[in-house]
Structures are given as C-alpha cells and as structure tokens.
Amino acid sequence: MLVKDFITKELPVLKSFDTGEYALALMDDFKLKHLPLLSENIYRCLVSEKDLLAMPDPTAIIGDPVLFSPSVQEDTHIYEALALVTRYQLSLLPVVSTEGEYRGVITRDKLIDILSELCNADTAGSVFVLEVMPQDYSMTDIARLIE
C-alpha cells in the first residue's frame, strides 16, 4: 500500500504571496492545522496554525520561510506516512515526487481510515487475546484452544 494510491489534491495550498490572515481562514474553513507552502509547484514547507498565530502582523505576506518541511515521496509505504503524522502530530502530510514536485497530500483522517481497513476494525467478529509465557508457547495448544 503506497501513499500515491491515497493522495488528495482537493485541499488548498499556500503561496509565498498569501497573507497569514488568508492562511488562517483557509485552515479554519477546511478544519486543518497545517497547509503546504508551494513555490512554482515545488513543495517548500509545511505552515502550521501555530506559526501563523505567532506572526506579529497577520496581514503581512507569508513570504518564503524556511520552516519545518516533512513530506513523503509517492512510492513510500503507508506505514511510514503514518509514523510521520503521528510523530509530529500533523493534520496532513505533503506528498512529493523524487524531484520535490508537489503531488498532493494525505490527511490524518485518511490514514486512520486506511489503518482501520487494514485491521478489519469495521468488520463483525471477535478478537481473542491470549497471554502465554514464552516458554509455554505452543502453536498446537493455541490452535486447540481456538477450536
């Protein structure tokens, strides 16, 4: 399961000439805490709501800051994307080509949906948890218990 299969391009991006006020409004409209900043379709950084609120003048343009820029390439496995989103508490993760060209994003919500599907969380059934000491572990005993 690769990231390229779950990319969305429906979310807005920021440009260096956008204002902090505009970026905050976009984040509020789309219920996001982060938005990617692009320059000529090249991913530059991930702008957070926290960074924008810390701006002395929210009506000033964002410019081309060198900030935090996490991203994954299109051929990255979904687990690596999940690890980054979890580690940095991101609302979305930009996806780029090998040349750094912006391809879209994968959202935290989409990653949770994928994880749920992988774990069969929405399927009816049961989960058995067996606590066994390592020296007592025997696959035949476990199979007999399950039968």
Regions found by a protein language model. Give the residues of each.
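Extended, non-globular alpha-helical segments
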Residues: L53-M55
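Short amphipathic alpha-helix segments
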Residues: Q135-E147
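Long, contiguous binding/interaction regions
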Residues: D113-C119, A124
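Short hydrophobic beta-strand motif reused across regulatory alpha/beta modules
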Residues: K33, C45-K50, S91, R103-L111
